């Protein structure tokens, strides 16, 4: 089934060229189907690139998905035009009374800044709090995963001596679980961050469960025991060249970055990159959307209330 996107969104042409099924709002409005409503809070600098990456994953699921793009209103984007933001993005005040099937909160290049020093931290906290009552399931990615664990569970991250960048091997750490259905025992995923959460601190928290981890990269997938919040410490949405583009950028800025691990052939930046995470990244988002959103969300979103669908089934 297609991902349903606003008419004329730039990502549409890219996705169609990759044979990913997308549908305009105009065409979808003529179908008698209740699409999943997913809100994306896009905190990444290059909005269009991140939109495309996430829509690519959502478009590979068997469900029709309608997407709203959300911005932090008083945070002007330096890398995306004002026209694009005003045309395709909504402010929180516009949607605060809405309910959604799912919410995705992206990463952000804020890994070395204390959460309380982030200029829009109060807005992030407000949206996270709102999501606990107005969204069936929330998917936090990379920086957002750290932010969510800090705000909701008072877990603190530790800064790394060097940026952790690369593609790392992970293993499942739980019994068969819907979020990992179809996963191999071991799989790869990209990471790009300056901090990490102490995996033992997560394990000891009574409201959290570690589903996948890496010897090199630590905790990867963490689930709240009420199944409402999914925290992914890496970037399953990254495309083939994303880590390379970040590396080249950092070299150009004189930051002397480490070469992304397990990414270039023979660990040589002059050679091609090796993609070995796309299938599991796609499966992760598909499982989340199916088992944690579609199977649990009310048909009429106005029926959503303070009790989550998971609690209603107890």
Swiss-Prot record:
Provide the residue positions that the database annotates as binding substrate: 163, 192, 249
Where is the protein found, in the record's own terms?
Answer: Cytoplasm
Provide the GO biological process annotations: L-methionine biosynthetic process from homoserine via O-succinyl-L-homoserine and cystathionine
Q: Which reaction does it catalyse?
A: L-homoserine + succinyl-CoA = O-succinyl-L-homoserine + CoA
Mainly resides where?
cytoplasm
The annotated site for Important for acyl-CoA specificity falls at 111
Question: What GO CC annotations are associated with the protein?
Answer: cytoplasm
Answer whether the UniProt record assigns the keyword Thylakoid to this protein. no
According to UniProt, residues marked as the site described as Important for substrate specificity are: 192
So what family is this one in?
Answer: Belongs to the MetA family.
Under HAMAP family, the record lists: MetA_acyltransf
Annotated protein name in UniProt: Homoserine O-succinyltransferase
Its gene name is metAS
């Amino acid at each position: 089934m297609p991902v349903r996107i606003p008419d004329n969104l730039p990502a549409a042409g890219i996705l169609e060229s990759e044979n990913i099924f997308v549908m305009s709002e105009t065409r979808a409005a003529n179908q008698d189907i209740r699409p999943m409503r997913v809100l994306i809070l896009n905190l990444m600098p290059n909005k269009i690139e991140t939109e495309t990456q996430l829509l690519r994953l959502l478009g590979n699921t068997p469900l029709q998905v309608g997407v709203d793009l959300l911005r932090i209103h008083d945070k002007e984007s330096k890398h995306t035009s004002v026209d694009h933001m005003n045309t395709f993005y909504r402010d929180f005040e516009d949607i605060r009374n809405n309910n959604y099937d799912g919410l995705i909160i992206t990463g952000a290049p804020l890994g070395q800044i204390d959460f309380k020093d982030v200029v829009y931290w109060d807005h992030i906290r407000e949206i996270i709090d709102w999501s606990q009552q107005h969204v069936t399931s929330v998917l936090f990615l990379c920086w957002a995963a750290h932010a969510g664990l800090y705000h909701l569970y008072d877990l603190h991250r530790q800064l790394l001596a060097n940026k952790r960048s690369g593609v790392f091997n992970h293993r499942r750490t739980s019994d068969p679980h819907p979020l990992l259905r179809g996963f191999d025992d071991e799989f790869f995923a990209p990471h790009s961050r300056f901090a990490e959460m102490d995996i033992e601190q997560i394990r000891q928290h009574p409201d959290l469960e570690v589903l996948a981890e890496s010897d090199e990269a630590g905790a990867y997938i963490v689930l709240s025991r009420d199944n409402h919040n999914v925290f992914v410490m890496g970037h399953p949405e990254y495309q083939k060249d994303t880590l390379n583009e970040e590396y080249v950028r950092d070299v150009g800025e004189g930051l002397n970055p480490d070469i992304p691990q397990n990414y270039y052939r023979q660990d040589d930046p002059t050679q091609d990159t090796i993609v070995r995470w796309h299938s599991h990244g796609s499966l992760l988002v598909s499982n989340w959307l199916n088992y944690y959103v579609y199977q649990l969300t009310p048909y009429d979103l106005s029926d959503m209330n303070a009790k989550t669908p998971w609690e209603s089934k107890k």
